[in-house]
From Swiss-Prot:
Gene Ontology CC entries for this record: cytosol
Tagged with keyword Manganese: no
Binding site for (R)-5-diphosphomevalonate: Y19, W20, G21, K22, R74, S153, G154, S155, A156, C157, R158, T209
Pathway: Isoprenoid biosynthesis; isopentenyl diphosphate biosynthesis via mevalonate pathway; isopentenyl diphosphate from (R)-mevalonate: step 3/3
An example Gene Ontology molecular-function term: diphosphomevalonate decarboxylase activity
Catalysed reactions, as listed in the record: (R)-5-diphosphomevalonate + ATP = isopentenyl diphosphate + ADP + phosphate + CO2
SUPFAM superfamilies according to UniProt: GHMP Kinase, C-terminal domain, Ribosomal protein S5 domain 2-like
Protein name per the record: Diphosphomevalonate decarboxylase
Organism the protein comes from: Eremothecium gossypii (strain ATCC 10895 / CBS 109.51 / FGSC 9923 / NRRL Y-1056)
Region (Disordered): 378-397
A Pfam family per the record: MDD_C
The family this protein is said to belong to: Belongs to the diphosphomevalonate decarboxylase family.
Length: 397
Protein backbone atom coordinates (compact mmCIF):
# COMPACT_ATOMS: atom_id res chain seq x y z
CA UNK A 1 0.00 0.00 0.00
CA UNK A 2 1.08 3.58 -0.66
CA UNK A 3 0.26 5.29 2.62
CA UNK A 4 1.31 8.82 3.51
CA UNK A 5 1.22 9.76 7.21
CA UNK A 6 1.71 13.00 9.16
CA UNK A 7 1.35 13.69 12.88
CA UNK A 8 1.15 16.70 15.16
CA UNK A 9 0.31 17.65 18.70
CA UNK A 10 -1.92 20.62 19.52
CA UNK A 11 -2.50 22.45 22.80
CA UNK A 12 -5.45 23.38 24.95
CA UNK A 13 -6.14 27.09 25.24
CA UNK A 14 -8.12 28.69 28.05
CA UNK A 15 -9.82 31.98 27.27
CA UNK A 16 -9.25 34.98 29.49
CA UNK A 17 -11.63 37.07 27.38
CA UNK A 18 -14.48 34.72 26.54
CA UNK A 19 -15.98 33.76 23.19
CA UNK A 20 -19.70 33.24 23.67
CA UNK A 21 -22.23 33.65 20.88
CA UNK A 22 -22.24 33.24 17.11
CA UNK A 23 -23.35 35.71 14.48
CA UNK A 24 -23.18 32.92 11.89
CA UNK A 25 -23.58 29.32 13.08
CA UNK A 26 -22.64 27.71 9.78
CA UNK A 27 -19.27 29.49 9.55
CA UNK A 28 -18.70 29.68 13.33
CA UNK A 29 -18.37 33.46 13.26
CA UNK A 30 -18.36 34.95 16.77
CA UNK A 31 -20.26 37.91 18.16
CA UNK A 32 -17.08 39.20 19.81
CA UNK A 33 -13.31 38.89 19.66
CA UNK A 34 -11.60 36.81 22.36
CA UNK A 35 -8.21 36.26 23.98
CA UNK A 36 -6.65 33.11 25.44
CA UNK A 37 -3.52 31.64 26.96
CA UNK A 38 -2.11 28.52 25.29
CA UNK A 39 -1.18 25.86 27.85
CA UNK A 40 1.84 23.57 27.84
CA UNK A 41 1.49 20.32 25.91
CA UNK A 42 3.59 18.54 28.52
CA UNK A 43 0.38 18.46 30.56
CA UNK A 44 -2.56 18.88 28.14
CA UNK A 45 -2.45 18.00 24.48
CA UNK A 46 -4.11 16.21 21.61
CA UNK A 47 -1.93 13.98 19.41
CA UNK A 48 -3.34 13.40 15.93
CA UNK A 49 -2.07 11.37 13.00
CA UNK A 50 -3.57 11.68 9.53
CA UNK A 51 -3.04 9.23 6.68
CA UNK A 52 -4.07 9.09 3.05
CA UNK A 53 -3.49 6.82 0.09
CA UNK A 54 -5.26 5.57 -3.03
CA UNK A 55 -6.21 2.29 -1.35
CA UNK A 56 -8.18 3.81 1.54
CA UNK A 57 -11.88 3.13 0.98
CA UNK A 58 -13.54 5.79 3.16
CA UNK A 59 -12.85 8.66 5.53
CA UNK A 60 -12.51 7.27 9.05
CA UNK A 61 -11.83 8.66 12.52
CA UNK A 62 -10.67 7.01 15.74
CA UNK A 63 -10.72 9.04 18.96
CA UNK A 64 -9.07 7.71 22.11
CA UNK A 65 -9.06 4.21 20.68
CA UNK A 66 -12.69 4.12 19.55
CA UNK A 67 -14.19 4.57 16.06
CA UNK A 68 -16.13 7.82 15.79
CA UNK A 69 -18.33 9.28 13.07
CA UNK A 70 -16.81 11.78 10.66
CA UNK A 71 -20.28 12.66 9.46
CA UNK A 72 -20.92 15.87 11.35
CA UNK A 73 -21.13 18.97 9.18
CA UNK A 74 -18.33 20.86 10.94
CA UNK A 75 -15.75 18.14 10.42
CA UNK A 76 -16.84 17.67 6.82
CA UNK A 77 -16.45 21.42 6.19
CA UNK A 78 -12.91 21.36 7.61
CA UNK A 79 -11.95 18.41 5.41
CA UNK A 80 -13.57 19.99 2.34
CA UNK A 81 -11.62 23.23 2.85
CA UNK A 82 -8.33 21.37 3.33
CA UNK A 83 -8.96 19.27 0.23
CA UNK A 84 -9.73 22.42 -1.77
CA UNK A 85 -6.37 23.91 -0.79
CA UNK A 86 -4.61 20.66 -1.70
CA UNK A 87 -6.48 20.55 -5.03
CA UNK A 88 -5.25 24.05 -5.85
CA UNK A 89 -1.71 22.90 -5.07
CA UNK A 90 -2.11 19.87 -7.36
CA UNK A 91 -3.40 22.12 -10.16
CA UNK A 92 -0.27 24.26 -9.87
CA UNK A 93 2.02 21.22 -9.67
CA UNK A 94 0.54 18.36 -11.75
CA UNK A 95 3.24 15.90 -10.65
CA UNK A 96 2.03 15.91 -7.03
CA UNK A 97 0.15 12.83 -5.75
CA UNK A 98 -3.62 13.39 -6.07
CA UNK A 99 -4.18 13.37 -2.33
CA UNK A 100 -7.23 15.63 -2.63
CA UNK A 101 -9.06 12.73 -4.31
CA UNK A 102 -8.09 10.12 -1.72
CA UNK A 103 -9.79 9.22 1.54
CA UNK A 104 -8.38 10.08 4.96
CA UNK A 105 -7.80 8.08 8.12
CA UNK A 106 -7.48 10.23 11.24
CA UNK A 107 -6.45 8.86 14.64
CA UNK A 108 -6.49 11.15 17.66
CA UNK A 109 -5.92 10.84 21.39
CA UNK A 110 -6.16 13.27 24.30
CA UNK A 111 -4.24 13.02 27.55
CA UNK A 112 -7.19 14.62 29.40
CA UNK A 113 -10.96 13.95 29.67
CA UNK A 114 -12.89 14.66 26.47
CA UNK A 115 -15.90 17.02 26.58
CA UNK A 116 -15.33 17.82 30.24
CA UNK A 117 -14.85 21.55 30.13
CA UNK A 118 -11.11 21.29 29.41
CA UNK A 119 -11.33 22.69 25.87
CA UNK A 120 -10.92 19.25 24.29
CA UNK A 121 -12.71 20.25 21.09
CA UNK A 122 -10.31 23.18 20.60
CA UNK A 123 -7.20 21.02 20.83
CA UNK A 124 -8.88 18.25 18.84
CA UNK A 125 -9.89 20.32 15.82
CA UNK A 126 -6.62 22.25 15.87
CA UNK A 127 -4.66 18.99 15.78
CA UNK A 128 -6.89 17.54 13.04
CA UNK A 129 -6.55 20.56 10.78
CA UNK A 130 -2.80 20.96 11.33
CA UNK A 131 -2.12 17.23 10.81
CA UNK A 132 -4.03 17.16 7.51
CA UNK A 133 -2.46 20.46 6.39
CA UNK A 134 0.95 18.96 7.12
CA UNK A 135 0.02 15.74 5.30
CA UNK A 136 -1.08 17.79 2.29
CA UNK A 137 2.03 20.00 2.34
CA UNK A 138 -0.08 23.17 2.38
CA UNK A 139 1.91 26.44 2.17
CA UNK A 140 -0.61 28.61 4.03
CA UNK A 141 0.46 30.14 7.36
CA UNK A 142 -1.27 29.26 10.61
CA UNK A 143 -3.41 32.39 10.61
CA UNK A 144 -4.96 31.21 7.32
CA UNK A 145 -5.25 27.61 8.52
CA UNK A 146 -6.89 28.88 11.73
CA UNK A 147 -9.91 29.96 9.68
CA UNK A 148 -10.48 26.31 8.79
CA UNK A 149 -10.03 25.15 12.40
CA UNK A 150 -12.54 27.82 13.42
CA UNK A 151 -15.23 26.11 11.34
CA UNK A 152 -14.72 22.93 13.35
CA UNK A 153 -14.71 24.52 16.80
CA UNK A 154 -14.57 28.26 17.26
CA UNK A 155 -11.96 28.27 20.00
CA UNK A 156 -9.84 25.77 18.03
CA UNK A 157 -8.48 28.60 15.93
CA UNK A 158 -6.70 29.97 19.01
CA UNK A 159 -4.88 26.64 19.54
CA UNK A 160 -2.88 27.21 16.35
CA UNK A 161 -0.56 29.56 18.20
CA UNK A 162 1.38 29.42 21.43
CA UNK A 163 1.64 32.06 24.09
CA UNK A 164 -1.09 34.68 24.16
CA UNK A 165 -3.58 34.56 21.32
CA UNK A 166 -6.49 36.60 19.99
CA UNK A 167 -9.33 35.42 17.82
CA UNK A 168 -10.31 38.46 15.80
CA UNK A 169 -14.05 38.32 15.17
CA UNK A 170 -13.72 40.03 11.79
CA UNK A 171 -16.34 41.95 9.88
CA UNK A 172 -16.74 40.09 6.58
CA UNK A 173 -19.88 38.00 6.09
CA UNK A 174 -17.87 35.13 4.57
CA UNK A 175 -15.56 34.89 7.59
CA UNK A 176 -12.44 35.63 5.57
CA UNK A 177 -11.11 37.96 8.29
CA UNK A 178 -12.22 35.94 11.34
CA UNK A 179 -8.96 34.31 12.38
CA UNK A 180 -6.40 33.80 15.11
CA UNK A 181 -3.42 36.10 15.61
CA UNK A 182 -0.67 35.95 18.20
CA UNK A 183 -0.56 38.82 20.70
CA UNK A 184 2.72 37.62 22.23
CA UNK A 185 4.72 34.40 22.17
CA UNK A 186 5.71 32.21 25.11
CA UNK A 187 9.09 33.90 25.51
CA UNK A 188 7.47 37.31 25.96
CA UNK A 189 5.87 36.30 29.29
CA UNK A 190 7.10 32.80 30.19
CA UNK A 191 6.38 33.18 33.91
CA UNK A 192 2.63 32.62 33.50
CA UNK A 193 1.40 29.52 35.33
CA UNK A 194 -2.01 27.84 35.53
CA UNK A 195 -3.59 25.53 38.09
CA UNK A 196 -6.65 23.67 36.83
CA UNK A 197 -9.05 22.49 39.51
CA UNK A 198 -11.02 19.66 37.91
CA UNK A 199 -14.40 19.95 39.54
CA UNK A 200 -16.08 17.46 37.23
CA UNK A 201 -14.91 15.27 34.38
CA UNK A 202 -18.49 14.54 33.31
CA UNK A 203 -20.13 15.83 30.15
CA UNK A 204 -21.87 19.17 30.41
CA UNK A 205 -25.65 19.41 30.85
CA UNK A 206 -25.86 22.16 28.22
CA UNK A 207 -23.34 21.85 25.35
CA UNK A 208 -21.57 25.08 24.44
CA UNK A 209 -23.07 25.33 20.95
CA UNK A 210 -26.70 25.25 22.07
CA UNK A 211 -25.98 27.22 25.23
CA UNK A 212 -24.44 30.18 23.49
CA UNK A 213 -27.29 30.50 21.00
CA UNK A 214 -29.77 30.39 23.87
CA UNK A 215 -27.86 33.32 25.38
CA UNK A 216 -27.75 35.24 22.08
CA UNK A 217 -31.52 34.99 21.65
CA UNK A 218 -32.70 35.59 25.22
CA UNK A 219 -30.17 37.56 27.30
CA UNK A 220 -30.39 41.35 27.56
CA UNK A 221 -27.06 41.45 29.41
CA UNK A 222 -25.44 39.72 26.44
CA UNK A 223 -26.28 42.63 24.13
CA UNK A 224 -24.42 45.05 26.39
CA UNK A 225 -21.53 42.61 26.74
CA UNK A 226 -20.83 42.31 23.02
CA UNK A 227 -21.58 45.96 22.21
CA UNK A 228 -19.41 47.69 24.81
CA UNK A 229 -17.91 45.49 27.54
CA UNK A 230 -15.84 43.05 25.46
CA UNK A 231 -14.52 45.57 22.90
CA UNK A 232 -13.20 47.74 25.74
CA UNK A 233 -11.69 44.79 27.61
CA UNK A 234 -10.10 43.41 24.44
CA UNK A 235 -7.85 46.43 24.06
CA UNK A 236 -7.11 46.61 27.77
CA UNK A 237 -6.23 42.92 28.06
CA UNK A 238 -4.00 42.89 24.96
CA UNK A 239 -2.17 45.92 26.37
CA UNK A 240 -1.79 44.23 29.78
CA UNK A 241 -0.26 41.15 28.13
CA UNK A 242 2.17 43.25 26.11
CA UNK A 243 3.13 45.17 29.26
CA UNK A 244 3.32 41.98 31.37
CA UNK A 245 0.96 43.71 33.80
CA UNK A 246 -0.40 40.80 35.84
CA UNK A 247 -2.62 42.84 38.15
CA UNK A 248 -4.57 44.28 35.22
CA UNK A 249 -4.56 40.99 33.30
CA UNK A 250 -5.89 39.17 36.38
CA UNK A 251 -8.61 41.70 37.16
CA UNK A 252 -9.88 41.68 33.58
CA UNK A 253 -9.76 37.88 33.44
CA UNK A 254 -11.89 37.51 36.57
CA UNK A 255 -14.30 40.24 35.54
CA UNK A 256 -14.81 38.70 32.13
CA UNK A 257 -15.41 35.24 33.58
CA UNK A 258 -18.04 36.76 35.86
CA UNK A 259 -19.59 38.66 32.94
CA UNK A 260 -19.78 35.54 30.77
CA UNK A 261 -21.47 33.48 33.48
CA UNK A 262 -23.83 36.36 34.27
CA UNK A 263 -25.09 36.26 30.67
CA UNK A 264 -25.58 32.50 31.03
CA UNK A 265 -27.65 33.10 34.16
CA UNK A 266 -29.52 35.88 32.32
CA UNK A 267 -30.44 33.46 29.52
CA UNK A 268 -33.95 32.05 29.57
CA UNK A 269 -34.21 29.38 30.77
CA UNK A 270 -31.00 30.12 32.72
CA UNK A 271 -27.84 28.11 32.04
CA UNK A 272 -25.72 26.97 34.98
CA UNK A 273 -22.15 25.98 34.15
CA UNK A 274 -20.60 26.86 37.52
CA UNK A 275 -21.71 24.88 40.56
CA UNK A 276 -21.37 25.41 44.31
CA UNK A 277 -17.77 24.19 44.27
CA UNK A 278 -16.96 26.65 41.48
CA UNK A 279 -18.39 29.55 43.45
CA UNK A 280 -16.49 28.55 46.58
CA UNK A 281 -13.26 28.55 44.55
CA UNK A 282 -14.06 32.13 43.47
CA UNK A 283 -14.41 33.11 47.14
CA UNK A 284 -11.10 31.42 47.95
CA UNK A 285 -9.28 33.38 45.23
CA UNK A 286 -10.63 36.68 46.50
CA UNK A 287 -9.68 35.70 50.05
CA UNK A 288 -6.09 34.98 48.91
CA UNK A 289 -5.76 38.29 47.05
CA UNK A 290 -7.24 40.22 49.96
CA UNK A 291 -4.89 38.52 52.44
CA UNK A 292 -1.79 39.52 50.47
CA UNK A 293 -3.28 42.92 49.60
CA UNK A 294 -2.33 42.35 45.97
CA UNK A 295 -3.65 40.30 43.09
CA UNK A 296 -1.58 37.12 42.87
CA UNK A 297 -4.22 34.78 41.41
CA UNK A 298 -6.96 35.09 38.80
CA UNK A 299 -9.80 32.61 38.28
CA UNK A 300 -11.62 31.90 35.07
CA UNK A 301 -14.36 29.38 34.23
CA UNK A 302 -15.30 28.24 30.74
CA UNK A 303 -18.62 26.56 29.96
CA UNK A 304 -18.26 24.11 32.84
CA UNK A 305 -17.50 23.99 36.57
CA UNK A 306 -13.72 23.53 36.29
CA UNK A 307 -11.60 26.42 37.55
CA UNK A 308 -8.43 27.65 35.87
CA UNK A 309 -6.27 29.78 38.14
CA UNK A 310 -3.62 31.97 36.52
CA UNK A 311 -0.62 33.16 38.54
CA UNK A 312 3.04 34.06 38.07
CA UNK A 313 5.94 31.75 38.92
CA UNK A 314 7.22 34.26 41.49
CA UNK A 315 4.01 33.80 43.50
CA UNK A 316 3.88 30.00 43.28
CA UNK A 317 4.85 29.37 46.91
CA UNK A 318 2.36 31.93 48.24
CA UNK A 319 -0.53 30.60 46.16
CA UNK A 320 0.32 26.92 46.56
CA UNK A 321 0.60 27.41 50.32
CA UNK A 322 -3.10 28.25 50.32
CA UNK A 323 -3.97 25.56 47.77
CA UNK A 324 -2.10 22.88 49.71
CA UNK A 325 -3.92 23.89 52.89
CA UNK A 326 -7.27 23.36 51.14
CA UNK A 327 -6.52 20.73 48.47
CA UNK A 328 -3.41 19.04 49.86
CA UNK A 329 -5.12 15.63 49.93
CA UNK A 330 -6.31 15.86 46.31
CA UNK A 331 -4.56 14.09 43.43
CA UNK A 332 -2.30 15.96 41.01
CA UNK A 333 0.40 17.52 43.16
CA UNK A 334 2.81 14.63 42.70
CA UNK A 335 2.86 15.09 38.91
CA UNK A 336 4.49 18.53 39.15
CA UNK A 337 5.98 19.05 42.60
CA UNK A 338 8.50 17.09 44.65
CA UNK A 339 7.92 16.17 48.28
CA UNK A 340 10.39 18.92 49.24
CA UNK A 341 8.50 21.55 47.23
CA UNK A 342 5.21 20.56 48.81
CA UNK A 343 6.79 20.80 52.25
CA UNK A 344 7.95 24.32 51.36
CA UNK A 345 4.39 25.29 50.41
CA UNK A 346 3.06 23.96 53.72
CA UNK A 347 5.78 25.79 55.65
CA UNK A 348 5.02 29.02 53.78
CA UNK A 349 1.37 28.76 54.80
CA UNK A 350 2.15 27.88 58.41
CA UNK A 351 4.63 30.72 58.80
CA UNK A 352 2.90 33.51 56.89
CA UNK A 353 -0.82 32.73 56.88
CA UNK A 354 -2.04 30.32 59.54
CA UNK A 355 -3.77 32.12 62.38
CA UNK A 356 -3.80 35.43 60.53
CA UNK A 357 -6.90 34.97 58.36
CA UNK A 358 -10.02 36.97 59.13
CA UNK A 359 -12.17 33.95 58.23
CA UNK A 360 -11.55 30.22 58.36
CA UNK A 361 -10.67 28.29 55.21
CA UNK A 362 -13.39 26.12 53.69
CA UNK A 363 -12.70 22.65 55.13
CA UNK A 364 -15.16 20.95 52.78
CA UNK A 365 -14.10 22.55 49.49
CA UNK A 366 -11.63 19.79 48.60
CA UNK A 367 -14.48 17.26 48.42
CA UNK A 368 -15.83 18.91 45.27
CA UNK A 369 -12.52 18.74 43.39
CA UNK A 370 -11.44 15.54 41.64
CA UNK A 371 -7.82 16.52 40.96
CA UNK A 372 -5.46 19.40 40.25
CA UNK A 373 -3.42 19.94 37.10
CA UNK A 374 -0.49 22.35 37.30
CA UNK A 375 0.77 23.71 34.00
CA UNK A 376 2.12 26.84 32.32
CA UNK A 377 1.96 28.89 29.15
CA UNK A 378 3.19 26.86 26.18
CA UNK A 379 3.80 26.76 22.43
CA UNK A 380 1.45 26.06 19.54
CA UNK A 381 1.18 22.83 17.49
CA UNK A 382 4.35 20.74 17.46
CA UNK A 383 5.77 18.27 14.96
CA UNK A 384 6.20 14.84 16.49
CA UNK A 385 7.80 11.55 15.55
CA UNK A 386 5.07 9.75 17.48
CA UNK A 387 2.48 8.29 15.14
CA UNK A 388 -0.83 6.65 15.95
CA UNK A 389 -1.15 5.11 12.47
CA UNK A 390 0.60 2.04 11.06
CA UNK A 391 2.16 3.21 7.76
CA UNK A 392 1.83 -0.29 6.33
CA UNK A 393 -1.96 -0.49 6.73
CA UNK A 394 -3.20 3.05 7.36
CA UNK A 395 -4.99 1.75 10.47
CA UNK A 396 -4.47 2.64 14.14
CA UNK A 397 -1.40 1.07 15.73
Amino acid sequence: MSIYVASTTAPVNIATLKYWGKRDSMLNLPTNSSISVTLSQEDLRTLTSAATGPELAEDRLWLNGKPESLGNARTQQCLADLRALRRALETEEPDLPRMSEWKLHIVSENNFPTAAGLASSAAGFAALVVAVAKLYGLPQDYSEISKIARKGSGSACRSLYGGYVAWEMGAEADGSDSRAVQIADVEHWPEMRAAILVVSADRKDTPSTSGMQQTVHTSDLFKERVATVVPRRYGEMAAAIRARDFATFARLTMQDSNSFHATCLDSFPPIFYMNDTSRRIVKLCHLINEFYNETIVAYTFDAGPNAVLYYLAENEARLCGFLSAVFGANDGWETTFSTEQRATFAAQFDECVRGKLATDLDDELHRGVARLIFTKVGPGPQDTKSSLIDPETGLPR
